[in-house]
From Swiss-Prot:
This is UPF0502 protein ETA_20480. Pfam families: DUF480. It comes from Erwinia tasmaniensis (strain DSM 17950 / CFBP 7177 / CIP 109463 / NCPPB 4357 / Et1/99). Belongs to the UPF0502 family. Residues 169-188 are annotated as: Disordered. HAMAP family: UPF0502. Residues 173-188 have a biased composition (Basic and acidic residues). SUPFAM superfamilies: Winged helix' DNA-binding domain (SSF46785).
Length: 217
């Protein structure tokens, strides 16, 4: 497993920087105000947040300490920030444009299906087809720096399984697509208990009948 662990706000900040680095390069690196606006925008964000300047500033400072961002003093009074999460001069994590697109969108919107990712990643990377999306997810799941994404159990009524990033820690085991879910085991146990209770009740009735008939002394 990778060693990076982001809080929800840290994940939002890094996701915004990854996104804006590609979609609005003329506004990158980003100022505090730019990051706040990106974090709180209503489109392509799940959940929608209402972060304050101080909350975002504290998060930026923490990410700088974690060596995931660089604070740039460009000679003006405004400090600008650039991500060091991947493909930076000092970082070791190397990701393709397709991989960056998927990681950014998972950080910004949480778990999504390959079909959703193909549509939502279009502004960062235009996937040729679903095969490219699936191959990219597979590479991220087997990345040299540790597993970066995981396939979740398919939800009832859904055609596709969703994928989630692992940059905020392990996903709840009941959500993993490994075929072993606590709810399934609990359901099996409850069914077995009900069956045993029925068998006990049947035996008790049979014993009572035998006693009443005088067949048991």
């Amino acid at each position: 497993m990778n060693k990076i662990l982001f809080t929800a706000v840290e994940a939002r900040v890094v996701g915004c920087l990854l996104e804006k680095q590609v979609t609005t390069p003329d506004q990158y690196p980003m100022s505090l105000n730019g990051v706040v606006t990106a974090c709180n925008q209503k489109s392509n964000r799940e959940p929608v947040m209402s972060l304050t300047d101080s909350e975002v500033q504290n998060t930026l400072d923490m990410l700088v300490k974690k060596h995931q961002l660089t604070a740039l003093n460009t000679g003006s009074r405004v400090v600008k920030y650039e991500q060091r999460f991947c493909n930076s001069t000092f970082g070791q994590m190397k990701l393709s444009a397709a991989e960056v697109a998927i990681i950014a969108n998972l950080l910004l919107r949480g778990a999504q299906t390959p079909g959703e990712l193909r549509i939502r990643c279009a502004r960062i990377h235009d996937f040729a087809d679903m095969t490219e999306v699936e191959q990219t997810l597979e590479r991220l799941a087997q990345h040299e720096h540790g597993q970066l994404v995981v396939r979740l159990a398919r939800e009832p009524g859904k055609r596709e399984s969703r994928y989630m990033h692992l940059l905020s820690g392990e996903v709840d085991e009941s959500s993993r697509a490994d075929g072993h879910h606590p709810d399934d085991h609990r359901g099996d146990l409850e069914g077995r208990i009900a069956q045993l209770e029925q068998q006990v009740a049947t035996l008790q009735r049979q014993i009572a009948q035998l006693l009443n008939n005088g067949e048991v002394k």
